Amino acid sequence: MPTSIAARANLELIDQNYQRWQEDPASVDPSWSAFFEGFELGNLPQRNGAAATAAPRAGVRESSFQTRIDGLVYAYRTLGHTIARVNPLAEKRPENPSLTLRELGFSEKDLDLRVSSKFFADNEEMTLREMIARLQKIYADSIGAEFMHIQNTRMRNWVLHRLESRPDKHSTPRQVKIALLRALMEAESFEVFLHSRYVGQKRFSIQGAESLMVILDTILHKCPPAGVEEICMGMSHRGRLNVLANFLKKSLRVIFTEFSENYIPELVAGDGDVKYHLGYRTVRKLASGAEVEIRLSANPSHLEAVDPVVEGTARARQRIRGDTEHRRKVLPLLLHGDAAFAGQGIVAETLNMSQLHGYGTGGTVHVVVNNQIGFTTLPEDARSSMYATDIAKMIEVPIFHLNSDDPLACMQVSKLALDFRQEFGRDIVIDMYCYRRYGHNEGDEPAFTQPDLYAKIDRHPSVAQLYKRELLESGALTEDDAASLETEMDLRLEMALDNVKAIEKEKIDKQAKFKESTAVFQPEYKSSPVATAINEKTLKAIVDALTRVPDDFNIQPKIKRIIIEHRRKVFENGGPFEWHYAELLAFGSLLLEGTPVRLSGQDSARGTFSSRHAILYDAKSGAPYVPLMHLGEKQARICIYNSLLSEAAVLGFDYGYSLDYPSMLCLWEAQFGDFANGAQSIIDQFIVSAESKWQRPSGIVLLLPHGYEGQGPEHSSGRLERFLQLCAEDNIQVCNLTTSAQYFHILRRQMKRDFIKPLVIMTPKSLLRAEFASSSAKEFTSGKFEEILGSPEVGPADKMKRVILCSGKVYYDLINYRAEKKIDNAAIIRFEQLYPVHETKLKSMMKGFPKTTQLVWCQEEPQNMGAWTFIEPRLRKLFGREIAYAGRDASASPAVGSLALHKREQAALVADAFKV
């Protein structure tokens, strides 16, 4: 419930406004005026703690009554939604004791008194009875509005004015009313048709929520005059087929084909997905001649997981359309379920992004399809709040609760919602109360768990039937008109089905084409070498930018020494360039070639380990300076953002961005790799499988700090094993690099092939500044990325008795041990890229070793983690012999908590690699 002014304001602010009000009541906001009038009324003379018995002066009586009138208006604006008729299944209006005559300070005899309120713009005089009726019509009919919690006065007053000045819905032109009926009938007839023709098949029908189509159509037709050119949509399974058919106008023939038992999508690769998860792109041409592009994102069954993906896609589309300042041309439109909106934490994460510099999209229209049930769960078991939408109050946006049985109200609020978004660049929420006519899916029996509710639903006419009856009774529709519409709907569906049957008869053994979707086809993965080196001139240009600041920039002395002067010295000496220096060189070289870069993550601008410093800050003003934005006039743009403290939503956002902007290098960095599992659903359902399921490739790069250095179980593992377990069909690339030059080349390689794949890099911690892992300038101006590297051998290959295979920083422990112990019969091979495995290169490197050579896999991670369980069967199959293991024992926890114990384990596993 909204807080009072007193609860949310400080005493100094109250005092300032009170003094202004005493001088001129009109000089303060009406809500303050009502507060002060009530305050003075409460301070009338008292006697012995009771109200004074003497009658107050006439002026005081008038002031008291007027204060109550103004309080009445304020009460309805604040609490009217609590008694609004928004539930289509409710038999009577909800009650709120705070809105009774008695609680508001009136009695029955006051109802016919003439009153007015300066709270209303027209200040029109009317009876108290008429005023209450007016307030109920505005705030407690089919629309329940929550907006008084918004502290931005202009925003709050804008909503207030739009609500109180909106025209009577019944004055809507006849042709508009007929168009609304058509939308409702199309939605209903589609579901009824599927229900009768494809009995028992899951379709997750929209029945009971058909007014969603009114909301969508209203927003669509309002887009061109509002300046919106494109809609990026996300929604779950409920009603998705109907939205595809009747809003995005996907071919009915294709939809019906997907219901066929013989349907197999003709995929270039991959496995496909069920019909109610597929994405879609279309351009709707409206009667006005205007066109609006609509993109519906493919989504998994993980409810709300698609939300940040859509936001990222929308931001990318805004960049493509050149709308990065105001962000009004591309509209994110998210459809939610009530149980999921309240229950899934990623909703709050996504809402929290809405006004952040690196993640804002100019406001999102949220539509909650509130069928008042989650599978079998009722609202009282699904949330602790009054409304499913209460979580949205944290970002202070308007929330409109709607009765889906009132399509005219749905239309009015939809127009208001888009106008609000365009005016303020903020989110807005439509909470459409409806019901679910059948079970969670069409094979489920809801009466098992909600018998009373479903008895009521069975008796309840559809919104199309109710609205048709209303139009017939008002004379806006004739019986012939209604019959003609019904015939038109049925004929359209029957013709599409007949077409499908004819095609199936002709091509019974052929695969149907996978088309009319968001699919993007690309060449297969290949390990061909890619030219990634840069020339010395380019290297110098980047270093010059990285070691230069404006004359008026007050650089912090320590930053000047450890960053600017250090970087210049490294360059002049020809190296060694440490890890993040190499990264900035890769970024800079791509920018000079016209490839933009986006990096986001927690503390990514400086780097968790204070080693990146991609953004410098003025020591006096705090103003940021990005050296890589000063390479040259024709360079591309680099965007580096410190993210909110979220993994799932931020990774989802950056993944969505990468989908629609493949020509940009998009990177997401976890603060520690251990935290990446906070985004596991984004990784599992989107990043590793989207190309197989939906033909949606992505080139996103995940940077996951990983390495065993005695920092305990929460700061050691990027969960390498989980990513390797997800590898198949060349779906992703997984790397564990050992030199800064390798990092440089792989980042450049990511943008220089004719295909894209997600890239997961286990980035180092202790190697970030280590000289032995740093590279010379020559390694950037020549060479390329190497999937597998050897080590300087200590003798002829045919004299080797042992080959130790490894990946990551344990390599350095192994070569140090070998040198220290003067071992001359053990070779070491390191996998820089663990997947896809470059088998040809590995075989070539192993050719010179005797067949009797002992093969050992060495890793820092426990035996049930790291690469062992992934790589061992592949090596055994490749070489036809057993592979010995050297590493930590299997463990439930990634690492020990004791530094001393860690060191003991590390020393033992390194020694074992030369003994097992």
Listing of model-derived features with the role each one plays in the protein:
Residues 1-39:
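Subset of Sec-pathway N-terminal targeting signals
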Residues 374-385, 393-429, 433-439, 447:
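Conserved phosphate-handling catalytic cores of large alpha/beta enzymes
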Residues 5-8, 60, 203-210, 293-304, ...:
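Alpha-helix capping and helix-loop boundary segments enriched in small/acidic/polar residues
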Residues 189, 193-253, 567, 578-596:
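Active-site pocket-lining segments that scaffold enzyme catalytic pockets across diverse folds
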Residues 42-211, 228:
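Extended, charge-enriched "interface" segments that sit outside catalytic cores
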Residues 229-396, 400, 609-661:
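Cofactor-binding active-site loop characterized by glycine-rich and histidine/acidic residues
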Residues 67-74, 81-114, 188, 251, ...:
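Flexible, glycine-rich loop/tail regions that form catalytic "lids" or insertion modules at the edges
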Residues 168-190, 261-322, 627, 754-816, ...:
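Active-site cores of enzymes that catalyze phosphoryl transfer or operate on phosphate-rich substrates
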